[in-house]
């Protein structure tokens, strides 16, 4: 499989927010008696795991498919290019959030920023893939 396009975006704001929350939980845990401490430490660990899973978003386009994965690749998605009937560059509202979000009318995959590429699929579904290189990704998808 020949990769025609590949780009990784670091989720800086997400990392800073989640790791800061984990540090706050862990620091607060040491001020509490033992029973309450474990809940906060578990919360801190959960935030670190989520930060690791959503630390980046890598998007690649080959001659036949589009793939995207979060962080180390445990959350991985793919679709055939022939299933994409429309490609456009869009700007999301900050209210759409980050991560994997189901919004009215589309599903969003994003780690940082508001720019995205909207994909209209043959079956009528709409996907948005957030990226800081929306024009480059859209151009790679249009070259199919």
Go through the PLM ranges and name each one.
Residues 141:
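Short, well-ordered, aromatic-rich surface patches in folded extracellular/luminal domains
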Residues 33-41:
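Short, aromatic-rich membrane-interface segments at the entry and exit
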Residues 69-133:
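Non-transmembrane, membrane-adjacent beta-strand/coil modules in membrane-associated proteins
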Residues 12-25, 39, 46, 50-55:
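Short, small/hydrophobic-residue-rich motifs at membrane-helix boundaries and re-entrant hairpins
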Residues 40-52, 98-102, 106-109:
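Short, solvent-exposed secondary-structure boundary motifs
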Residues 44-86:
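Conserved beta-hairpin
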Residues 1-33, 108-116, 126, 134-137:
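N-terminal membrane-targeting/pre-transmembrane regions
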